[in-house]
């Protein structure tokens, strides 16, 4: 009951703030106002989708009722989080900065409006940016998206900007990190594929009908951005107290069943590029990207491949050299960043999407050997690519393709029991029915 009263009191404050902004009382610096500033039924708090407006106007309602982001703070008090806090010697997870960094909108006090409340979880401004400078004015008929961006709204129509925003928590950055200690305490390992994760969200936005290529461009750009961010994470981790940081490595190279060594596919295939017993660097964020890059910029793809192989050799050594890893990771991150810019402006028509589907599916032997996380990345990407392709071009094999995609996901259901040859076989089956 008290929670509902607090929400209503904050809502009243939000209306006062918005009214002031409409009168031109803009703060000197942008501030975070909280999700209630969007919650009016005439703004984003409606129940029904409105078709005659540029937005659905039920965005807040969708988020607060259906979206897991709205409950990100609340999970910090559940039994799993409580146990994690005990293991990590944290008094309370819902008060710990390392937890609040991603389970709430964690911003400095100076950037919070009086209506701000961190218990709202991962809310509107976590993605769209501090609203104080455009909150009131963006409701006028003459206002445009571009003017909102100029006033401080994050441009989530930009593939790179959207990817960076999501990856801040779904991979980490200089201020947010999930390390091996946190994973051992019970936090899930982090993985991400933009198109799949977006599709899993309750949709609170209108489709971009003016750009039918946007879904594939977003997916492809995000692959490059997440590799860049992974490389920057490696460079940061070389400066840490613990080295190597095991969260940078392939978890399931160690965390798998060891009882049937006579049937071990790992021993059968061998340990290319490393010694047996040396955990390999996690290549899942490169495994799919390499085919995208080769299609957009073949020379850039070759350069990236050379640099990745060099870093893989350093990182997959039992005594990985910190300084060598730092230099190579930074160099390769710059290469990945340049390629991300190219990909973000490239054309992704049905013909290119079809080529990517075939190229990734035919790369099953390589992808499968990079471990379960790489296989999972391929399954998610292939499904997203096919759904985007099917929305623009009909396939006579639609039923068979969807069945083959389902098999890919079945092969990665149990990460510790992952079998590379079986996943490679499933990829070959998919390649045979793709258009």
Regions found by a protein language model. Name each.
Residues 27-46, 241-250:
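Local sequence-structure signature of Cys/Sec-based thiol-disulfide redox active-site neighborhoods
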Residues 2-15:
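Bacterial N-terminal signal peptides that target proteins for export
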Residues 33-40, 92, 96-97, 121, ...:
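Residues immediately within or flanking Cys/His clusters that coordinate Zn2+
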Residues 14-24:
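Hydrophobic h-region of N-terminal signal peptides that target proteins for export
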Residues 24-27, 34, 44-49, 102-103, ...:
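Low-complexity, Gly/Pro
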Residues 362-435:
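A cross-kingdom marker for long, charged
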Residues 47-86, 113-122, 126, 130-375:
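Primarily the internal scaffold of c-type cytochrome electron-transfer domains
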Residues 79-110:
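Long, well-ordered hydrophobic secondary-structure segments characteristic of membrane-embedded
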């Amino acid at each position: 009951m008290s929670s509902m009263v607090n929400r209503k009191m904050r809502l009243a404050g939000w209306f006062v703030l918005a009214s002031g902004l409409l009168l031109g009382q803009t703060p000197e610096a942008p501030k975070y106002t909280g999700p209630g500033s969007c919650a009016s039924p005439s703004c984003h708090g409606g129940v029904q989708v409105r078709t005659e407006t540029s937005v659905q106007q039920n965005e807040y309602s969708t988020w607060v009722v259906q979206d897991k982001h709205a409950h990100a703070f609340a999970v910090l008090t559940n039994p799993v989080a409580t146990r994690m806090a005990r293991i990590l010697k944290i008094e309370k997870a819902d008060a710990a900065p390392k937890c609040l960094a991603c389970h709430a909108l964690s911003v400095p006090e100076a950037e919070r409006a009086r209506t701000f409340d961190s218990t709202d979880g991962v809310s509107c401004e976590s993605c769209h940016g501090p609203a104080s400078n455009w909150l009131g004015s963006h409701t006028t008929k003459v206002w445009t998206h571009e003017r909102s961006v100029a006033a401080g709204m994050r441009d989530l129509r930009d593939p790179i900007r959207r990817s960076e925003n999501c990856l801040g928590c779904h991979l980490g950055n200089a201020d947010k990190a999930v390390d091996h200690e946190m994973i051992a305490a019970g936090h899930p390992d982090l993985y991400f594929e933009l198109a799949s994760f977006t599709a899993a969200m309750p949709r609170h936005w209108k489709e971009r009908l003016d750009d039918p290529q946007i879904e594939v461009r977003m997916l492809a750009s995000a692959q490059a951005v997440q590799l860049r961010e992974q490389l920057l994470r490696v460079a940061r981790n070389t400066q840490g107290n613990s080295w190597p940081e095991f969260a940078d490595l392939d978890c399931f190279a160690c965390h798998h069943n060891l009882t049937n060594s006579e049937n071990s596919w790992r021993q059968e295939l061998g340990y290319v590029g490393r010694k047996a017993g040396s955990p390999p660097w996690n290549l899942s964020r490169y495994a799919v990207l390499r085919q995208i890059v080769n299609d957009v910029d073949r020379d850039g793809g070759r350069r990236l491949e050379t640099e990745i192989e060099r870093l893989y050799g350093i990182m997959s050594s039992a005594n990985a050299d910190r300084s060598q890893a730092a230099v190579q990771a930074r160099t390769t991150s710059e290469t990945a960043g340049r390629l991300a810019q190219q990909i973000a402006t490239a054309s992704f028509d049905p013909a290119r999407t079809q080529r990517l589907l075939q190229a990734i599916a035919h790369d099953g032997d390589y992808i499968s050997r990079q471990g379960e996380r790489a296989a999972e990345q391929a399954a998610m990407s292939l499904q997203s690519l096919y759904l985007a392709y099917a929305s623009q071009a009909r396939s006579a094999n639609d039923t068979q393709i969807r069945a083959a995609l389902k098999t890919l996901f079945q092969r990665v259901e149990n990460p510790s029991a992952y079998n590379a040859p079986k996943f490679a076989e499933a990829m070959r089956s998919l390649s045979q029915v793709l258009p």
